[in-house]
From Swiss-Prot:
It is found in: Cell inner membrane. This is ATP synthase gamma chain. InterPro entries: ATP_synth_F1_ATPase_gsu, ATP_synth_F1_gsu, ATP_synth_F1_gsu_CS. Coiled coil: none annotated. One of its GO terms (molecular function) is ATP binding. F-type ATPases have 2 components, CF(1) - the catalytic core - and CF(0) - the membrane proton channel. CF(1) has five subunits: alpha(3), beta(3), gamma(1), delta(1), epsilon(1). CF(0) has three main subunits: a, b and c. Produces ATP from ADP in the presence of a proton gradient across the membrane. The gamma chain is believed to be important in regulating ATPase activity and the flow of protons through the CF(0) complex. One of its GO terms (cellular component) is proton-transporting ATP synthase complex. Belongs to the ATPase gamma chain family. Keywords: ATP synthesis, Cell inner membrane, Cell membrane, CF(1), Hydrogen ion transport, Ion transport, Membrane, Transport. PANTHER family: ATP SYNTHASE GAMMA CHAIN (PTHR11693), ATP SYNTHASE SUBUNIT GAMMA, MITOCHONDRIAL (PTHR11693:SF22). PROSITE patterns: ATPASE_GAMMA. Disulfide bonds: none annotated.
Length: 291
């Protein structure tokens, strides 16, 4: 059995670790609430631009934007992988990367090559390590991701789609369900599904008649790009909320485990102390008997 001094040292070490994990839990909880608020504030804009884009597309049915045209043959596929820049968030990044790799293998089995864009340092590092075809990446988004930082890497993938380098674009991220539950998902971004546009177009009754300046097609082109940027930005904000939730849960579990370890070490310490006292008493009694 370890000595009392050694056990006291272990208890102090675990207590210090628990203080750190408890502080990280509280910080993550605060950041999670802010991330949820950003998600809530972004929804009205995303919904409005989706509705306007759908209305314009249906009002100008003779013009088909490349983003809504399905290609007969799908060769290369684009995949945007959203991960975190930091760790200590449970299995969040592991789940996203596992899902991405499995999907890439499935596409490979169908004869499709995957071109990847990485958002977040953890995903970028891993994808480079497995020699994935990473066409663009962005890291260092911080706790408050801004669309301006994402536009560059989004544009690379959109240009690749327009140029025919990829025939589909998907995004893999962690969807925020609630504080205790997050889910890694893959969603198709391009081509835009008819269901999304049809649903948005039918939400408003009557005919929408727009006056365009300078030209209807130019307006639609610009709105389509903004709409795709909004979809990807929304996925990033959901991933951020999921990251902070997962980190809060992970740090709470670590704090609880540390508390249990401290309790067990204190029991061991008390037993060691009791054994030492019993030994001393036995020696004293034995010495007295000898006299």
């Amino acid at each position: 059995m370890a000595g009392s001094k050694e056990i006291r040292s272990k208890i102090k070490s675990v207590e210090n670790t628990r203080k750190i994990t408890k502080a990280m839990e509280m910080v993550a909880a605060s950041k999670m609430r802010k991330a949820q608020e950003r998600m809530r504030m972004a929804r009205p804009y995303a919904e409005k631009i989706r509705n306007v884009t759908a209305h314009l597309s249906h009002a100008n049915s003779e013009y088909k934007h490349p983003f809504v045209v399905k290609r007969e043959k799908v060769g290369n596929v684009g995949l945007i992988v959203v991960s975190s820049d930091k760790g200590l968030c449970g299995g969040l990044n592991t789940n996203v990367l596992r899902l991405s790799i499995n999907q890439m293998k499935a596409w490979e089995g169908e004869g499709k090559k995957t071109i990847v864009s990485a958002i977040g340092n953890k995903g970028f590092t891993y994808l480079n390590r497995i020699n994935a075809d990473v066409k663009s990446h962005v890291t260092g988004l911080g706790d408050t991701p801004h669309l301006e930082k994402l536009i560059g890497t989004i544009k690379v993938m959109l240009d690749a789609y327009i140029a025919g380098e990829i025939d589909q674009l998907h995004i893999c991220y962690t969807r925020f369900l609630n504080t205790m539950k997050q889910e890694a998902v893959i969603e198709q971004v391009l081509p835009l599904s008819d269901d999304k546009l049809e649903t948005s177009a039918t939400t408003a009754k009557g005919h929408w008649d727009y006056i365009y300046e300078p030209d209807a097609n130019v307006v639609i082109d610009e709105l389509m790009t903004r709409y795709i940027e909004t979809i990807i930005y929304h996925a990033v904000t959901e991933n951020m909320a999921s990251e902070q939730s997962a980190r809060m849960v992970a740090m709470k579990a670590a704090s609880d485990n540390a508390k249990n370890v401290i309790g067990e070490l204190k029991l061991v310490y008390n037993k060691a102390r009791q054994a030492a006292i019993t030994k001393e008493i036995s020696e004293i009694v034995g010495g007295a008997a000898a006299v």
